[in-house]
A protein has these predicted regions:
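Intrinsically disordered, low-complexity regulatory regions
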Residues: 1-142
Length: 142
C-alpha cells in the first residue's frame, strides 16, 4: 500500500494532460527574426542540438538493453535507485575495458549510462544514494 502511494505521488505531476493545466514560461526577453517572428533567447536552456545523434543513439540502445535485462518498474528499474558507488564502479570498469580494447559490449555507452544515472539522482536531490567518498585536497584541509 505504501509503495502504491509513492507511485501515485510520483505520477501525480505527470497527470496533467490538458493545455489548460499549463502556463507558458516567459523570461521576458525577445529576439526579433528577419521574418518578423519573435522568440525568447536560447541562453541558459542548454544546446540539445549539439548532442551527438550517434552517441545518443548508442546510449538509447543501452537503455533498451537494460530495460530488457532488468524489466522491473516497466524497464525503469534503475530509477528506483541504488548507491552511487555501484554506478561509479561500473562506469570506471567499462571505461577501463574500453581502454583495454575490449569490444564484447558497448563499454562507452555503458559508462555513459552509469554517469547519466548518477546525474538523474543528483537532479532529483536523492542524496540517500550518494555514498561516494568526499575527498578534499590537502590545501583545503589546512
Amino acid at each position: 500500500l505504501q509503495s502504491q502511494r509513492k507511485r501515485e505521488e510520483k505520477n501525480e505531476g505527470m497527470m496533467k494532460c490538458s493545455l489548460n493545466d499549463f502556463d507558458i514560461a516567459d523570461g521576458g526577453d525577445r529576439l526579433n527574426y528577419d521574418g518578423g517572428a519573435l522568440r525568447e533567447p536560447m541562453t541558459g536552456k542548454g544546446r540539445y542540438d549539439l548532442i551527438s545523434p550517434f552517441a545518443l543513439d548508442r546510449l538509447a540502445k543501452w537503455y533498451e538493453k537494460g530495460s530488457k535485462k532488468y524489466p522491473q518498474n516497466n524497464g525503469r528499474n534503475w530509477e528506483m535507485g541504488m548507491p552511487f558507488s555501484r554506478y561509479m564502479d561500473s562506469a570506471k570498469r567499462h571505461l577501463n575495458k574500453f581502454l583495454m580494447g575490449e569490444t564484447d559490449e558497448d563499454h562507452l555507452a555503458a559508462a555513459a549510462w552509469n554517469i547519466f544515472a548518477i546525474m538523474h539522482h543528483q537532479e532529483r536531490h536523492e542524496t540517500r544514494w550518494d555514498d561516494l567518498p568526499k575527498y578534499k585536497k590537502m590545501e583545503d584541509v589546512r
